[in-house]
């Protein structure tokens, strides 16, 4: 199995991936709080982890992927009160919205999507264990985690308790043993959902939810935990304290991976700053593949600045890849035979495949991996031009292997799935026959030197997304997918 290195936020260095269970990769990614439609800052981690999961499967790992929904939260409660509907109505509405846009972006469904609201018993049990072990204490129906009890607190974020207290922006609660102690259970308040517990009616705190759900489905030690870099502190720091305090297992997570922010004019995009763009709105102007490619065009740990110009660039890049796919599908139909050029193309394809895998195996560097993909696309297009400029034959065995390699690349990145289908819809035969009639009429115009009419046919087809390519072997049409 190919060696993979990952950048571990905990150790602040790259490490060779060594799974808890050989041959398996267990990953937990913090999901959305469903109180609004997802914006592209929300989308980045899920597209990133979709690619990580795809590549881990390609390498040969059995992947278990868990992603939660934080469907009990202050923001959901505030939205429900503002609209005069129940909190679960709000949560369900925006969970549906999440799935709609992620499906459009080609994000494959996680194996498990636990919700906080259906795991209250697990959360209560974990809190009780923390109390029993001396890590937590109850105050007037609230339960707090005592950060001073956990010796590793601050290791993920690289902060000491003194640093945290000095820079804290939290309400001072004189009842707590330490200002940094955080809520595991919140006593019920009027107008909020609540559940029964040993400490009275209430609801979970934010951090305990992920600890309880990750351990339930992945065990007390698992491989990957991911999320945005804004979650390092306090959320993931607190998760570690809870999970390891409860189980005694250190570390509870072997590798912590965090993606960078999406920025607008170098400022972090977020709902709280009101400078965000909803995925559903962007998809009204750009294809899902264009947005997905944009999100993967920079290494996941680096910031990514959003602009219409970047999305236009993504569209143009995908058109180049789509052309290479169409050319490969055309070459598959050419006359079979031996050809040294095809073998040379295959040798280059294998070299690009190795480069692609090297990049993905080095902390999932999609920016570098896609450069290999474009390198191969260029070689495919050059070869296609050589074949169509003469009456040539094609080594079909070589082309089939080049196709496998190129499709592997686009499958891992998760783009242009429909392009590989070619024109295979329900009316494909009729569509092809109609296009051949149009092309024959255009060719007759060219032969009779009616250039303006021939150009008019070409231009009108272009307006509806159909491109005509002329070669010595005749005209070929293709429909733009992006």
Regions found by a protein language model. Give the residues of each.
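Alpha-helical recognition segments enriched in aromatics with Gly/Pro capping
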Residues: 1-35, 46, 50, 64, ...
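N-terminal, positively charged nucleic-acid-binding surface of large information/translation enzymes
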Residues: 11-14, 20-106, 473-477
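Short phosphate-binding/catalytic loops that engage adenosine nucleotides
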Residues: 61, 135, 466
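The substrate-binding groove and active-site-proximal loops of carbohydrate-active enzymes
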Residues: 80-87, 111-117, 228-229
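Short, glycine/charge-rich beta-strand/loop segments that flank catalytic centers
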Residues: 69-74, 95-98, 108-123, 141-150
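Structural preference for alpha-helix termini/caps and helix-kink/transition segments
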Residues: 268, 276-482
């Amino acid at each position: 199995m190919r060696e993979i290195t990952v950048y571990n936020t905990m150790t602040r260095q790259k490490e060779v991936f060594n799974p808890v269970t050989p041959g398996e990769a267990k990953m937990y990614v913090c999901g959305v709080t469903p109180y609004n439609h997802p914006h592209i800052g929300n989308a980045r981690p899920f597209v990133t982890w979709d690619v990580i999961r795809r590549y881990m499967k390609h390498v040969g790992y059995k992947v278990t992927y868990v992603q939660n929904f934080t469907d009990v939260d202050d923001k959901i409660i505030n939205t429900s009160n503002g609209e005069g509907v129940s909190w679960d109505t709000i949560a369900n509405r925006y969970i549906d919205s999440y799935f709609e846009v992620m499906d459009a972006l080609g994000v494959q469904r996680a194996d498990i999507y636990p919700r906080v609201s259906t795991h209250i018993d697990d959360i209560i049990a974990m809190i009780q264990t923390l109390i029993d072990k001396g890590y937590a204490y109850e105050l007037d129906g609230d339960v707090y985690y005592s950060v001073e009890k956990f010796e590793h607190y601050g290791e993920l974020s690289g902060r000491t308790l003194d640093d945290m207290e000095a820079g804290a922006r939290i309400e001072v609660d004189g009842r707590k043993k330490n200002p940094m102690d955080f809520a595991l259970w919140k006593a019920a308040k009027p107008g909020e959902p609540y559940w029964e517990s040993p400490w009275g009616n209430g609801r979970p705190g934010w951090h305990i939810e992920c600890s309880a759900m990750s351990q339930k489905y992945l065990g007390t030690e698992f491989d990957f935990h991911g999320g945005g870099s804004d979650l390092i502190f306090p959320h993931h720091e607190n998760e570690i304290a809870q999970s390891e305090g409860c189980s005694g297992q250190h570390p509870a997570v072997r590798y912590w991976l965090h993606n960078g922010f999406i920025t607008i004019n170098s400022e972090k995009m977020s709902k709280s700053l009101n400078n965000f763009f909803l995925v559903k709105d962007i998809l009204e102007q750009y294809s899902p593949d264009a947005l997905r490619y944009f999100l993967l065009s920079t290494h996941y740990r680096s910031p990514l600045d959003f602009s219409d110009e970047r999305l236009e660039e993504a569209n143009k890049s995908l058109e180049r890849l789509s052309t290479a796919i169409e050319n490969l599908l055309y070459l598959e139909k050419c006359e079979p035979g031996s050809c040294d050029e095809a073998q040379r193309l295959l040798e280059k394809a294998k070299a690009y495949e190795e480069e692609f895998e090297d990049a993905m195996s080095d902390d999932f560097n999609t920016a570098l991996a896609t450069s290999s993909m474009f390198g191969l696309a260029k070689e495919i297009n050059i070869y296609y031009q050589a074949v169509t400029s003469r009456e040539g034959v094609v080594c079909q065995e070589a082309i089939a292997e080049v196709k496998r390699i190129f499709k592997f690349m686009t499958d891992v990145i998760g783009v242009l799935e429909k392009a590989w289908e070619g024109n295979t819809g329900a009316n494909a035969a009729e569509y092809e026959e109609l296009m051949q009639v149009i092309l024959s009429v255009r060719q007759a115009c060219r032969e009779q030197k009616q250039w303006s009419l021939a150009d008019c046919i070409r231009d009108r087809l272009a307006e509806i997304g159909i491109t005509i390519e002329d070669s010595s072997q005749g005209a070929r049409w293709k429909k733009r997918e992006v």
